[in-house]
């Protein structure tokens, strides 16, 4: 059995949402130790999972790796669609666990696009790899319109910078009780299209100054 543990991530936003600049997006965020996701993975003849939210990722992983099947048990997790990056962490945890169970190299950065991850921000992939405070370089604007690319038709943005946070830093997370969730899927895509269509390129210049000079 293989056990994979990873923490949530906080996404602070994007450096640039304007098509006037050569690179679009450019995620900024930080990996957390808690809340965390813990999954147990082992070989199986079919796809078996005790969590319906994980099953689509597990099926995609089994297909991507070309293995017969896998069994995943979720021992600990954090809420979905609450800004903590659960989708990417679930997908990459399944990928890493199944790959290791079969003696394969996970290669999460390379395979994340085939699991639908890293299409805008590379922060979730980068924090899964090594944690820390992360800034990625974004995607080439020339390859993008206000619509997202077809699934898998991208590479995860390279990391521009990664910094280890001081050990005494703490983040206080306050999440509302109940089933309230943030946007995802088509709803999130619509919001992002609107943001890109109306983005002010001058704001990106100000953000770049803050990130690189202060």
For the regions a language model picked out, list residue spans one by one.
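DPxDG-like acidic metal-binding loop motif
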Residues: 84-109, 125-140
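ATP-dependent small-molecule kinase catalytic core of the GHMP/sugar-kinase superfamily
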Residues: 20-23, 110-214
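Electropositive phosphate-/nucleotide-binding environments in soluble metabolic enzymes
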Residues: 6, 36, 51-55, 88, ...
């Amino acid at each position: 059995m293989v056990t994979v543990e990873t923490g949530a991530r906080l996404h602070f936003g994007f450096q640039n949402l304007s098509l006037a600049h050569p690179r679009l997006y450019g995620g900024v965020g930080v990996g957390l130790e808690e809340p965390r996701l813990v999954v147990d993975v082992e070989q199986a003849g079919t796809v078996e999972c005790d969590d319906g939210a994980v099953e689509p990722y597990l099926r995609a992983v089994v297909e991507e790796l070309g293995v017969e099947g896998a069994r995943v048990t979720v021992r600990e997790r954090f809420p979905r669609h609450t800004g903590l990056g659960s989708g990417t962490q679930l997908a990459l945890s399944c990928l890493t666990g199944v790959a290791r169970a079969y003696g394969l190299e996970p290669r999460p950065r390379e395979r994340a696009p085939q699991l639908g991850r890293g299409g805008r921000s590379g922060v979730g992939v980068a924090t899964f790899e090594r944690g820390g405070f992360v800034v990625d370089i974004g995607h080439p604007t020339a390859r993008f319109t206000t619509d997202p690319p077809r699934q898998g038709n991208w590479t995860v943005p390279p990391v521009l910078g990664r910094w280890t946070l001081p050990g005494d830093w703490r983040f206080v997370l306050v999440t509302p009780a109940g089933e309230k969730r943030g946007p995802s899927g088509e709803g999130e895509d619509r919001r992002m299209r609107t943001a890109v269509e109306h983005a002010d390129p001058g704001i990106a210049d100000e953000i770049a100054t803050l990130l690189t000079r202060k």
